[in-house]
Regions:
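A generic "folded-domain core" signal
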Residues: 1-164
């Protein structure tokens, strides 16, 4: 069941991924949302799993977001243009690195395109971030995603992160 108005119920697109389709009423734009729920819960809310969502409009990626399902702490660094960011540690398969993701109203983080491209081709994806009850890790199993479907809907292909 989808939480968004005018969006069809999700269908499996391989592994633990779901795809939700809709049409924007005013513009007629085709919207596709891919969602991956984490394998675990955060301490603050044992009923809501953290999730990753990819939003695509008319065949292009518009936003990749990480929603932890808990209220985020204040931003801890400025971005390139001064927007507030939260630094997280990301693990994609056997590579890990720190990223500053844009902090969106204290509810979710906007991921960079490089991380999204690494995620869609990965078997292991983990995000460690500060929460109000200490550092926590969201663990995902992204393997099995139909990459042809993501390429059609978002013009996105996987890319392994560099180890340097």
């Amino acid at each position: 069941m989808t939480p968004y108005q005018n969006e069809q119920d999700g269908v499996s697109v391989g592994g633990k991924w779901l795809e939700f389709d809709s049409i924007e009423k005013m513009t007629g734009a085709k919207k596709v949302r891919f969602e991956l729920l984490s394998d675990n819960y955060f301490r603050e809310d044992p009923d809501y799993k953290p999730r990753v969502e990819l939003f695509c409009v008319d065949g292009k990626l518009k936003l990749g977001d990480f929603n932890p399902g808990v209220k985020l702490p204040p931003p801890n660094r400025p971005g390139f243009w001064g927007q507030p960011q939260l630094q997280v540690m990301v693990r994609i398969d056997d590579t890990h690195y720190f990223k500053g993701w844009n902090w969106m109203r204290g509810h979710f983080l906007s991921m960079d395109k490089g991380t999204v491209r690494g995620l869609i081709g990965a078997q292991v994806f983990k995000v460690e971030l500060p929460t109000r009850s200490g550092r926590q890790i969201a663990e995902f199993s992204p393997g099995g995603l139909n990459l042809d479907r993501v390429r059609q809907a978002c013009d996105l292909t996987p890319k392994k992160p560099s180890k340097d």
